[in-house]
């Protein structure tokens, strides 16, 4: 989106705080249904980030696939489980939580120290001048379709097979 600077910055901060709060909700809430709803908030905020960066197709795919299908499937699976097993012997802080928080904190600190020192200019993709003219004539969704049917044909087919196996497994579990 082409927004003025202060509005764009406000939306970035707002969506970033939504991502952080939703992520904390996924990890820290003891009720798995609330965690699944927090995951939905994280996925919606991620798709709004895609909209802010002018990737409308990726945002629509994020909403349809992850929020509309995966998160609903997670909620469906959680609602099939017995809810009483989550509240037995609930401790506020365990040794595993401490180890996990130490690992996550060390990864966070290493990222914070590494990211400012990285030269990002060499990572930006460069294209030839004739490719820029060709890319202007084709829309983003057409480019994605061309890449999926040519360059990424094998990974696309492997993902479809994995999703088919997951669907067959879900049907088998639902029948029992």
Swiss-Prot record:
EC number from the UniProt entry: 7.1.1.-
GO cellular component: chloroplast thylakoid membrane
The keyword NAD belongs to this UniProt entry's keyword annotation: yes
Alphabetically ordered keywords of this record: Chloroplast, Membrane, NAD, NADP, Plastid, Plastoquinone, Quinone, Thylakoid, Translocase, Transmembrane, Transmembrane helix, Transport
Coiled-coil ranges per UniProt: none
Pfam families: Oxidored_q3 (PF00499)
Functional note: NDH shuttles electrons from NAD(P)H:plastoquinone, via FMN and iron-sulfur (Fe-S) centers, to quinones in the photosynthetic chain and possibly in a chloroplast respiratory chain. The immediate electron acceptor for the enzyme in this species is believed to be plastoquinone. Couples the redox reaction to proton translocation, and thus conserves the redox energy in a proton gradient.
Full protein name: NAD(P)H-quinone oxidoreductase subunit 6, chloroplastic
Organism: Panax ginseng (Korean ginseng)
